[in-house]
Amino acid sequence: MAAVDLEKLRASGAGKAIGVLTSGGDAQGMNAAVRAVTRMGIYVGAKVFLIYEGYEGLVEGGENIKQANWLSVSNIIQLGGTIIGSARCKAFTTREGRRAAAYNLVQHGITNLCVIGGDGSLTGANIFRSEWGSLLEELVAEGKISETTARTYSHLNIAGLVGSIDNDFCGTDMTIGTDSALHRIMEVIDAITTTAQSHQRTFVLEVMGRHCGYLALVSALASGADWLFIPEAPPEDGWENFMCERLGETRSRGSRLNIIIIAEGAIDRNGKPISSSYVKDLVVQRLGFDTRVTVLGHVQRGGTPSAFDRILSSKMGMEAVMALLEATPDTPACVVTLSGNQSVRLPLMECVQMTKEVQKAMDDKRFDEATQLRGGSFENNWNIYKLLAHQKPPKEKSNFSLAILNVGAPAAGMNAAVRSAVRTGISHGHTVYVVHDGFEGLAKGQVQEVGWHDVAGWLGRGGSMLGTKRTLPKGQLESIVENIRIYGIHALLVVGGFEAYEGVLQLVEARGRYEELCIVMCVIPATISNNVPGTDFSLGSDTAVNAAMESCDRIKQSASGTKRRVFIVETMGGYCGYLATVTGIAVGADAAYVFEDPFNIHDLKVNVEHMTEKMKTDIQRGLVLRNEKCHDYYTTEFLYNLYSSEGKGVFDCRTNVLGHLQQGGAPTPFDRNYGTKLGVKAMLWLSEKLREVYRKGRVFANAPDSACVIGLKKKAVAFSPVTELKKDTDFEHRMPREQWWLSLRLMLKMLAQYRISMAAYVSGELEHVTRRTLSMDKGF
């Protein structure tokens, strides 16, 4: 990956013009992308034009193409849809339409186009690019432009961003809008659950996605739905009987509701559509259950974008500008995609080709291949859904007993992880215990065996159902060892924050004294602070960022109404500045003070002066985030006094300490799924390790790799031994020594109009799409 030279970049932006348009169906997060492209373009010295109403505006020209300034895209990051409008355009599909579009671009000197839309919009852009030379020749022949003009603007560069709630584009893990659409679906499912339980009802929910089952699949996984229909994996013949059996069985076990999720493109093995009304009639006729159909429709496109979509779009928008600046006549039109947590550029047509192949595989009834072509994460979701949805009695009972506990502060997604771990353990024939109140509960013997149905309905619950404590094992090792012996525990799964990691480390270090601790252990990092070594993302931090972001959106609205007001907002996170930084990007904050990025009085002075300058423009509001432990002396109160004094007569100041509301209510779809997957993967790893260390009728594990932290690192799931992570940990400040998200701070400062050296900006490389990159199990 190449670091970019600032001066070269400034020069490369000068004299260039970038046009940005949104096309096709709208998606939440498009505004964040428009904002990022506009501001990054202006930042590097280019002119940026907003093209209104998609390709229609491009063809019609005139008032539809306007030059943007920094303020044009202010206060739009929190809005759903697209402020520059989108339209499906017939004219652009004709040669005349594209010729008119080329003329309009040349009139404004635009030779760089950033297109935000679905695969149709991006394919259209590529056709436009390939015809560009001949379109200009025709314009010269018609006498509309001179030959000199044609030579000056002889080449068109294209960078695409995929904006589609369906997540149906090959080559990217997530498209802009998908996460927000999942938020809408989960909000509806959570609301429906309460009414269904009151009446003992069955609900058939139809979700969008055209020919792609991603939304249906992920919402089924995140809600623990009883049955699922997706186009990529049609049910076996005779599914009607299986489904009714399953629903009857769930009801007889005391469940008061059944949820059936159906993708709008659902089909059976013969390609015949399966409709929600057909499924409803089937349940009513066969089982006599009170059944209702809810078609979610365009609700899924609406509402405010989630934090994930705002950050994804901002990151992709900036990367798209870099791709346009670095493009040459020989580089292919590219699309900026996401792989793990990395931005990657892929050739647009390779992705479109692969996306078409999925549809072709489905048309030819090659369903297994279609699932594979959707990518590793789709396939993985499908396998995990099948594993957890329905209990299959284990082939044989194992001799192993495992215990699961929560340690640290409550975090959203803990219950999802416990649920999936319990069910995976049971399906492997293990005896599964849960421990209440963390290590303290283990010392006191608060241990109980659980069955498959004991964890039903846990997925959408926030906090910790098992109860959690911060106490470390150190002071009560004797009692803990005693209970491990009494219950015959062979493995521990600890779901929690920094204390969970530190606690397991203490148990491992005590193995020399207590043979009972020579068991297999795994930590699932779950904390809103995202400060556990061995993973890029902790469970619960996505929910926390969304909770903090919603609060900041409201605070910003208050500031907009009051005029000339600056809010200083304090976030949690201990010494770790992840929450403050990521929330800052999601709400378009002016600054975010964190411990990892040391600041002094000079920096504060620059910030205050920047704020005073900003108040002279039309944007008369400010938002500053401060992590709770970012500085010993520059406290929230100090910042309030400083800003109040320096801003006297220009702006006034207020503070807000967000506090425990950041632990969030119901977990976000990301945390429900991430928790579910971590629970499954951790349990599979524990099972495998137990078989490895089982000798002569007993478990004896004392190798470093028998006690690990599971986490997502860059693009894959990794298991890191706690003893090896010790050297990478700053125990005094309770966080990893190196943190990947610090690179995001550059984005925060640039989008807030701070002039900074871009030497640290790392732009994505151009990679290629192959079947291997898609079906390779990237972990998630």
From Swiss-Prot:
In Gene Ontology terms, what is a biological process of this protein? negative regulation of insulin secretion
Instruction: From the UniProt record, give the pathway where this protein acts.
Output: Carbohydrate degradation; glycolysis; D-glyceraldehyde 3-phosphate and glycerone phosphate from D-glucose: step 3/4
User: Which one of the record's GO molecular function terms can you name?
Assistant: 6-phosphofructokinase activity
UniProt GO cellular component terms: 6-phosphofructokinase complex; cytosol; extracellular exosome; extracellular region; ficolin-1-rich granule lumen; membrane; secretory granule lumen
The positions annotated for binding ATP are: 25, 88-89, 118-121
Sugar attachment sites? 529
**E.C. number(s) listed in UniProt:** 2.7.1.11
Give the main localization category. Answer: cytoplasm
Q: Where is this region: C-terminal regulatory PFK domain 2?
A: 401-780
SUPFAM superfamilies documented for this protein = Phosphofructokinase
Q: Mind telling me which Pfam families this protein's record contains?
A: PFK (PF00365)
Cofactor(s) this protein requires: Mg(2+)
Residues binding Mg(2+): 119
Q: For substrate, which residues are the binding ones? A: 164-166, 201, 208-210, 264, 292, 298-301
* Record comment: activity regulation: Allosterically activated by ADP, AMP, or fructose 2,6-bisphosphate, and allosterically inhibited by ATP or citrate. GlcNAcylation by OGT overcomes allosteric regulation.
Q: Which EC class heads this enzyme's classification? A: transferase
**Modified residue annotations for Phosphoserine:** 377, 775
Region (N-terminal catalytic PFK domain 1) location: 2-390
Q: Where in the cell is it found?
A: Cytoplasm
In this UniProt entry, the residues modified to Phosphotyrosine are: 640
**Protein modification:** GlcNAcylation at Ser-529 by OGT decreases enzyme activity, leading to redirect glucose flux through the oxidative pentose phosphate pathway. Glycosylation is stimulated by both hypoxia and glucose deprivation.
Q: Additional comments on file?
A: In human PFK exists as a system of 3 types of subunits, PFKM (muscle), PFKL (liver) and PFKP (platelet) isoenzymes. Glycosylation may play a role in cancer cell proliferation: inhibition of 6-phosphofructokinase activity and subsequent redirection of the glucose flux through the oxidative pentose phosphate pathway confers a selective growth advantage on cancer cells. Moreover GlcNAcylation is observed in multiple cancer cell lines and tissue samples and GlcNAcylation leads to larger xenografts tunors in mice.
Protein task = Catalyzes the phosphorylation of D-fructose 6-phosphate to fructose 1,6-bisphosphate by ATP, the first committing step of glycolysis. Negatively regulates the phagocyte oxidative burst in response to bacterial infection by controlling cellular NADPH biosynthesis and NADPH oxidase-derived reactive oxygen species. Upon macrophage activation, drives the metabolic switch toward glycolysis, thus preventing glucose turnover that produces NADPH via pentose phosphate pathway.
What is the protein's given name? ATP-dependent 6-phosphofructokinase, liver type
Q: Record the organism.
A: Homo sapiens (Human)
At the highest ranks, the source species' classification is: Eukaryota, Metazoa, Chordata, Craniata, Vertebrata
Gene encoding it? Answer: PFKL
